[in-house]
């Protein structure tokens, strides 16, 4: 999923959870999306760190 859409969906589910609550299916989706987001961020950090050179 594209990062922008991933973040939009995570934010939507968060707001909905505060206003109306989430169904079990939505809670599972929220957890899956958050895990996917974290994996993307971890991958980005690893790439950035691999480009760092010792001086």
UniProtKB/Swiss-Prot annotation:
A single GO CC term for this protein reads:
cytoplasm
Coiled-coil residue spans: none
Q: Which UniProt keywords apply?
A: Cytoplasm
- Cellular compartment(s): Cytoplasm
Q: Which Pfam families match?
A: DUF896
Q: Which domain of life is it from?
A: Bacteria
InterPro entries, alphabetized: DUF896
Q: Which family does it belong to?
A: Belongs to the UPF0291 family.
In Swiss-Prot or TrEMBL terms, this protein is called UPF0291 protein CA_C2726
Q: Which organism is it from?
A: Clostridium acetobutylicum (strain ATCC 824 / DSM 792 / JCM 1419 / IAM 19013 / LMG 5710 / NBRC 13948 / NRRL B-527 / VKM B-1787 / 2291 / W)
